Amino acid sequence: MDEVKASSLFEKVILPLRDDEYLDGDGLPRCKSCHTLRVYVSDDKTFCARCLCKCQSEQIEKEKELEAIRRNLEEFYDRQRLSLMGDRYKDCRLSTAVITEHNRAAYARAKRYVEYAADMRRENIGLYFYGDNSSGKTYITACICNELLRKGYRCVYTNFARILSEIRSGYSGDGMGELDIMRKLMTCDFAFLDDFGKEFIGREYNRSAAKWAEEKLFEMINARYNSKRPTVFSSNYAMDELASKL
């Protein structure tokens, strides 16, 4: 901006000097910190008005960034609450996971899945982690879920035992209800089913209950597949082992 003698301008307008300002050689107020102008003067030198100096503008941008971070965190916690994830796994992050030779390949796959989440969602690509008890498969799927929630995706993290419990409770008016929970599972961007396959254990002792559970399970999985919504599984069983139990 063309810096001009502004004494005559300031005689005609009320523009008190602030504590953090000083007048430069042209009689224009500048910031004591960044030394940039705090006033705009028109090209024809007939108008002047207050404006932000460099550090004021930077402060406003920082406040906007902090507000965006705060808003994003609030939205993340809302999505996390709606995801049905319990308190035990709500802080799981890929960045803080303990990587060992045993799980390195699995975590590399998990990080790649999160990195290309948009492609995974569009192409309906899920994941299947399996291993023995305490192998870390639940933790890694919880990490993936939290990372996707932070990216803004709608996720549901649960296991089928809980789904069935909610449905049964809904019949007595205490749970979410079958329609609500099935809709939630069928319409979220990514569904996470922990301990997949346990619902088939002991089916020979209660065939009617097992049949009902299987119907609900395959109804949900089939609906997600047809609507191209990925599902991430963790299980104690390899796929061929699981197939033998069906």
Question: Where are the predicted features?
Answer:
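N-terminal pre-Walker A segment at the start of P-loop NTPase domains
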Residues: 94-120
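Short glycine-rich substrate-engagement loop in P-loop NTPases that contacts/grips substrate
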Residues: 104-111, 145-187, 204-207
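Walker A/P-loop nucleotide-binding motif
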Residues: 121-141
